[in-house]
């Protein structure tokens, strides 16, 4: 089952450079209430990779553009009022609709 973001993680995120792609991704996911587990499945990487990006670690070129587009889509849907997700079921459903395939629990 996906976990919520810890206070320690949130403090680290707010201290990190918001201009880094992964940190911007983290801000969007936290605002949208999208769990890292489901974000990782959506981006086809491990949960640990997503957390690494969230903390500002480098993103390989092959994944950078995907992370940027994902961030833009999520931020746009926040503005439109489609996000934040009210619960885990809504978060999962939102991401499944985005990629057109089911995510694992």
Can you say where each PLM-predicted feature lies in the sequence?
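Charge-rich, solvent-exposed alpha-helical interaction surfaces
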Residues: 28, 69, 73, 90-98
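Short, charged recognition helix plus adjacent turn
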Residues: 2, 78-105
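DNA major-groove recognition helix of helix-turn-helix/homeodomain DNA-binding modules
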Residues: 62-80
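A short, Lys/Arg-rich alpha-helix, primarily the initiator
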Residues: 2-32
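Short alpha-helical "recognition helix" segments of helix-turn-helix
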Residues: 38-40
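N-terminal interaction modules that seed assembly of large macromolecular complexes
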Residues: 33-34, 51
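Recognition helix of helix-turn-helix/homeodomain-like DNA-binding domains
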Residues: 44-60
